């Protein structure tokens, strides 16, 4: 989590260096890219040799700092992850990757961006049990509400195609843990960004974590007390036996 936090901070600092005209130009280039790859088949990022020939400038578009194009925030599990260009092994080890054959996650009708990560990493948080998630590109925040979760075969990625009039972002990862024979898709549909909604989710998450921490603390105290009482009983029995012998 520390490295992810540092990367997110680097992105936020880098985004501040762009003025309004420069940001508008980056969005324009991203929109052009999205139009150019419309209708292109999506390749499974976890299969060796997958991928398509892409424009030479792909990694330059929306590149704020060190290959990062934005951040993904999932308030219900209290996590913010950096989003990088591409889905190389190196990228997936340190954050979320953008599948190149899909739209840049800048929103817009008829777009379907796909982001991927390694579900199996011990320190990774799962893309499950989501409610709302948020994409930040520069200072623009896009809100998505989970509307579909499904498990598919890696040979059938037709669900990742864009739909007319829809604005989707799908989070893709391997499943089940340790086997990785299928793909878990968590799709979100664009909603109006309301900061108060995100704050409410964050507050709910904090309360839940506090209750869990309190419960764990009580459980530990009970276990310690039981262990102490058991030790006391054994010690008392030994003392009683010695007294009886005397």
Where are the language model's segments positioned?
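Solvent-exposed, non-transmembrane regions of membrane-associated and secreted proteins
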Residues: 1-211
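C-terminal single-pass membrane-anchor helix
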Residues: 200-246
């Amino acid at each position: 989590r520390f490295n992810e936090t540092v990367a997110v901070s680097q992105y936020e600092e880098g985004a501040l260096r762009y003025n309004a005209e420069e940001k508008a130009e980056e969005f324009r280039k991203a929109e052009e890219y999205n139009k150019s790859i419309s209708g292109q088949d999506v390749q499974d990022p976890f299969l060796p040799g997958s991928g398509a020939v892409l424009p030479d400038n792909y990694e330059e578009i929306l590149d704020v700092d060190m290959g990062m194009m934005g951040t993904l925030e999932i308030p219900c599990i209290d996590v913010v992850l950096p989003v990088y260009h591409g889905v190389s092994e190196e990228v997936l080890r340190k954050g979320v990757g953008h599948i190149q054959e899909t739209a840049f996650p800048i929103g817009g009708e008829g777009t379907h961006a796909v982001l991927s990560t390694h579900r199996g990493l011990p320190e990774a948080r799962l893309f499950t049990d989501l409610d709302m998630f948020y994409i930040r590109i520069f200072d623009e925040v896009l809100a998505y509400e989970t509307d579909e979760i499904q498990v598919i075969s890696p040979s059938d990625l037709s669900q990742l195609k864009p739909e007319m009039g829809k604005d989707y972002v799908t989070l893709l990862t391997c499943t089940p843990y340790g086997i990785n024979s299928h793909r878990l898709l968590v799709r979100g549909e664009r909603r109006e960004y309301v900061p108060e909604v995100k704050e409410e989710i964050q507050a709910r998450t904090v309360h839940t974590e506090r209750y869990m921490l309190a419960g764990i603390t009580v459980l530990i105290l009970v276990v310690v007390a039981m262990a102490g009482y058991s030790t006391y009983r054994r010690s008392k029995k030994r003392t009683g036996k010695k007294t009886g012998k005397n």
